[in-house]
Amino acid sequence: MISKNIKLVKGVLDSLVEDSKGLVVMDFGCGKGVFAEHLKELGHKYIGVDIDRDALEGLSERGFTTYHPDNLPKDLGVDILLLGNMGGIETGMHLINARKLLTYEGVVFMWDFSYQGLPKGKSQSTVAMSVVSKGG
């Protein structure tokens, strides 16, 4: 069963790739690549990046391009960079470095469903999702 959160992200992804084919989408912190098949079906190239070598191996076996963050080429021409549920990772530095991977009109899409760090008074059902940055 697909969770509400994944459905929500897929909906935003669909709007980002709408009317496009052949975009390069990099999923930073991809895990098992929950969006890989969906993006492939829509005609886009999916690249998974994670520190979990087992997860990367599973994605590779399914025919997807994968990289460990330490071995990431700088010339991939990424159109959409996905940064989801990054947890304790220093997000600010990732955003700075991520912009270097993007094409001129590339987009960083960041979301977090962990609810940690929400201002007091916000319910856990509040989810912050936004297009964070345009490359260039």
Where are these regions (language model features)?
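A short glycine-rich, Lys/Arg-flanked "PGG" loop and its adjoining helix->strand segment in the class I
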Residues: 93-104
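Conserved beta-strand/loop positions that form the S-adenosyl-L-methionine
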Residues: 28
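Class I SAM-dependent methyltransferase SAM/SAH-binding core
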Residues: 34-66
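Core SAM-dependent methyltransferase catalytic element
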Residues: 125-136
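Conserved glycine-rich SAM-binding loop
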Residues: 31
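A short SAM/SAH-binding and catalytic strip from SAM-dependent methyltransferases
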Residues: 79-92
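Conserved alpha-helix/loop element of class I SAM-dependent methyltransferases that forms part
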Residues: 2-21
